[in-house]
Swiss-Prot record:
Gene symbol of the encoding locus: rlmE
PANTHER family xref list: RIBOSOMAL RNA METHYLTRANSFERASE, RRNA METHYLTRANSFERASE 2, MITOCHONDRIAL
Annotated Gene Ontology cellular component terms: cytoplasm
Alphabetically ordered keywords of this record: Cytoplasm, Methyltransferase, rRNA processing, S-adenosyl-L-methionine, Transferase
The protein, known as: Ribosomal RNA large subunit methyltransferase E
Family membership: Belongs to the class I-like SAM-binding methyltransferase superfamily. RNA methyltransferase RlmE family.
Species: Aeromonas hydrophila subsp. hydrophila (strain ATCC 7966 / DSM 30187 / BCRC 13018 / CCUG 14551 / JCM 1027 / KCTC 2358 / NCIMB 9240 / NCTC 8049)
Phylogenetic lineage: Bacteria, Pseudomonadati, Pseudomonadota, Gammaproteobacteria, Aeromonadales
């Protein structure tokens, strides 16, 4: 059998991934992904997560953010996580596997949230990348719009929102939408985010009902 050759871009990604200090650090610490260092840095600056809070984590797999969040909110807090991909269980995290773009999955997610509002909505979602920037940007903006819709449905007054967004077409319009809904909005580029990546994190606090 002929071994499949990687494209130049995927070969570069693989080399970056295995040489990445944050990947190595995550493996050494037994963490689920390098993404935990991003939310850790955001938490250090913005103090979004506190004991007893209820958190919704969108695009949760493999579970780095959920793992971090449940450690922050503690036994009296709740983390409700959702992803289209499977995720190994985490003590204290209520995980729903499914595509929350589908009405049945969204309904199940809202049912798990229950009648009480949540304190934080966080989203590290990204689409499956096609390699065509225009297509990928449109897909990613669609996902972040859905995450903002989730805020409108479940976030309590003065709640917080942290979302990964790729800079490009639609970014400025989306940022303005968030500014209308929250009292304070910041853009973060964590040190653990690859410099070449267009990703940034919008951190919004003080949700206006």
């Amino acid at each position: 059998m002929t071994q499949k050759k990687h494209s130049p871009s995927s070969t570069r990604w693989l080399k970056e991934h295995f040489d990445d200090q944050y990947v190595k650090k995550a493996q050494k610490l037994g963490l689920r992904s390098r993404a935990v260092f991003k939310i850790d840095e955001i938490q250090g600056k913005d103090k979004l997560l506190k004991p007893g809070m209820t958190v919704v984590d969108l695009g949760a797999a493999p579970g780095g953010w959920s793992q971090f969040a449940i450690d922050q909110v503690g036994d009296k807090g709740r983390v409700i996580a959702c992803d289209i991909l499977p995720m190994d269980s985490i003590a204290g995290v209520d995980f729903l596997q499914g595509d929350f773009r589908e009405e049945t999955v969204l309904g199940a997610l809202l049912e798990r949230v229950g009648p009480d509002k949540v304190d934080v909505v966080m989203s590290d979602m990204a689409p499956n990348m096609s390699g065509t920037q225009q297509v990928d940007q449109a897909r990613s903006m669609y996902l972040v719009e859905l995450a903002l819709d989730m805020c409108n449905q479940v976030l309590r007054a003065n709640g917080s929102f942290v979302v990964k967004v790729f800079q490009g077409e639609g970014f400025d319009i989306y940022l303005n939408e968030i500014r209308k809904l929250f009292t304070a909005v910041k853009i973060r580029k964590p040190d653990s985010s690859r410099a070449r990546s267009r990703e940034v994190y919008i951190v919004a606090t003080g949700f206006k009902l």
